[in-house]
Structures are given as C-alpha cells and as structure tokens.
Amino acid sequence: GGGAGIFVTNIIVFGVWFWELDRGGPFARKAGENPYPDFMFPQMSGVPAQVARPDWRPTFVDYLYVSITNVMAFSPTDTMPLSARAKLLMTVQATVAVSTLVLVVARAVNVLP
C-alpha cells in the first residue's frame, strides 16, 4: 500500500514539475517568452502534418506521460530532456523510484518467516 502511494505521488509530483519547468511553465510557454525547450517531444521534431498539427503544443498530459515513462523505464523514452535541469530532474525521479522499489522489496523480504 505505502509503496504504491509513493509511486503514484512520484509520478504526479514530477509530472507537475516537468510541466512547470519546460520553458518557464505553461503561461510563459503560451506567451512565447522562452523559445528554447527543456524537453523535445516527438511532435516538435518536424514530423509530417498527418501525425501532428503544426500548432501542436505540449499539455499537462504530455508531461505526466513523460513522468510515467521515466519511472517505468528509468530513462527517457520518446521525449528527450534537453537542458541540464531537465536531465537532473529526471535523474532524481528515477533515483527516487529505484530507491522506493529497493526499500519495498527489502521490507517484503524482511517480513518473510
């Protein structure tokens, strides 16, 4: 129970942090204040118009997905971190996930008769 709570909290908290980090947050992104992204989503890499709209912008769900895949794979999957702060934040998230997993497994082994 406790490990699952930490796991879900890790995903949500880091999803919010990724959303707030990228280009200064959602309001700064909308205003176009910072043209340099912290994350490179596949839709931003010149994919054909049949795959992504030309005006596509990441939403909170996209950052939550990045958080989920980072925890599950312990690495970036389709969305690459570009800035040092994005890389550090993803590293911290994966470290928290691995540490939680190790502690839960150690506790489970410890309670065996």
Question: What are these model-derived regions, one by one?
Answer:
Residues 1-27:
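Pore-domain transmembrane helices of cation channels
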Residues 22-78:
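Membrane-proximal soluble regions of multi-pass membrane proteins
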Residues 57-113:
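Pore domain of cation channels
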